[in-house]
Amino acid sequence: MNKARVKSMKKFWLVLSLAMFCLVVASLWEYSLNDWSVDKKLFLFQERLKFEEKRIDDQLRKLDHEAERQNPEWKGKQSVLVGFKGSKLVYWSNERIGSPRLYEILSAGNDLVKINNLYFDVRKHAVGDTVYYALLFIKEDYPYSSNYVKSHFNPSLGENLDDANKVIIRETWEAGGELVYNRDGRPLFKIESRVEHGDVVP
């Protein structure tokens, strides 16, 4: 064989080997960055959730000083306050939620409840013989979507998805997803992202 041809074949294989090595390193680098960004986004989501829980807990503690008032002041567009004496509803801050079994659902003691299509983080506080439940809105989840009705997350928990159907909330005992904890350290729910590259995680 010709020396020039052997030399050019060696260069060809060297360049091909270097290109393959660079592709492998680049794909490993992208994979590690992708994993890191999902972990970071989950961490930020959880921190925002804890911040909102603290804000709600502070408002609930203020109810101790407003016990004599019939209608306590409740601030927050992304939360609902309901109060029960026994099983009788005595206070309802807004009409965002409604269910004939509302007392049963809330008194079961779960930290996460789904009422109709809405997921809520439940914070409980008793003032005298009235038990208040503050419900922090997490996600509105529809089994379908249209131009008028779309699943969406609470905007105070982070950026919203164009299609929140790609992010699934699961019970803590279900398989799949990453655990999200409340500020008391208890598992609240699992979140599983089926978000493609370029979409935004909540």
Locations of regions flagged by a protein language model:
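N-terminal sensory and localization modules of signal-transduction and trafficking proteins
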Residues: 1-202
